[in-house]
Structures are given as C-alpha cells and as structure tokens.
Amino acid sequence: MTRRVHVIKDPEVAKLLADETRRQILNKLRHDEHSTTDLAKALNRNHSSIVHHLNQLLDAGLIEVTREEKVRNMVQPYYRSVSSSFHVAYSLTEALSQDPDYSAWQEEYIDNMLLALNGYGISVPEERRGEAKTLLQTCYLGQKKAYEERITKRISVPEVSKYAARNTANVLSHIQLMKDKEYMDALHRLSEIIEEPEEDQQG
C-alpha cells in the first residue's frame, strides 16, 4: 500500500518534478502499476526516453518496481509510485528558486492560478496582473507551508470518511494561516483586486 503523502526534502529530487514527462509518469503511477511499454504508449514517447525518466525516478526513490513479467525471453518490470501524493518541502523554496527549470515550472503554475480566476468570472486588469501573481504566489506558499506543518503533526489516521478528514484538515489549515501575517496581508490585498467593481476595472 502506497503512502498518502511523500514529502520531498532533497532539492535534487524536487528538481526532477520540473520535467513535464516525469510528472506525467508519476501521475500515471500514482493510480496503478505500469510497464515501460504501457507508459510509452500512454504518453506517446519513445521507449528509451521512458526508460531514462523511470531510472531517474527510481534512483530518487519516488517509484518502485512492483513485479516483473517475462515477455519474449525478456524481463519486463512494472512500476508504481511510492505515494499517492508528492509534496515538495516548503524549506526548499529559496534553494529551488535558483534553479531555472524549477522556477519556470512554478511560474507556469502561478500563471495557471491567475488564469483559473476566469472560471469564476474574475478578470484581473492587465496593469494589476503582475501584482496579482505576486500575491497568489505568497498565498500559495503560505498554504504549502501550513499543509506541510499540518501533515507532520498528524499522529494517526482517524477512521472517518476521507471527506470529513479533508475538511477537518482544511479548517485546521485556515486557523493556522490566520496567524500568518504575510499570508493574511496578501489575501486582503488580493481580495481588493478581484473584488474591484467592474466599472473601476474598466477605468
């Protein structure tokens, strides 16, 4: 049985997640075991490329071999991730900001958060998009830190539904975040941007 959350504390391991193909492989292996051939077909990648990425993930301890099967006189291993969820430690934030690939990935993530606001009918004015991105990043990192602290303090997994457990965890995170002045300041400033009357946004 895989662990529910795997906290990555090694910056070199965290950098592996900056590659989209490796993220896609991990996502596949979180749900079920797959062979190299399975992954190559599913991701439309050549076999040697998948082998390369699998070896990196295997060496990093993010995946494991679950079984081996003999196919045409060859041994074909099957892989699965060691966890259903991966979390890059908040303590690595500063170190990883110096890595161009990881920084680009995180930049894209924040861009997507900004874009996701459109789904709620929220359009951030062009002149305030830079500010909104900075505030979103502060909120994201604050939530990331609170989540990490929360899961490290959990001493057992209660026998309740996953939805009840998740909502309880969210309440605890909100209580913790209320004590984070930087997070709360960013949240209030962000709310001022996204709650501006439409006529004000249009100038």
Give each language-model segment a name:
Residues 61:
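Glycine-centered, phosphate/nucleic-acid-interacting loop/turn motifs that mediate DNA/RNA or nucleotide
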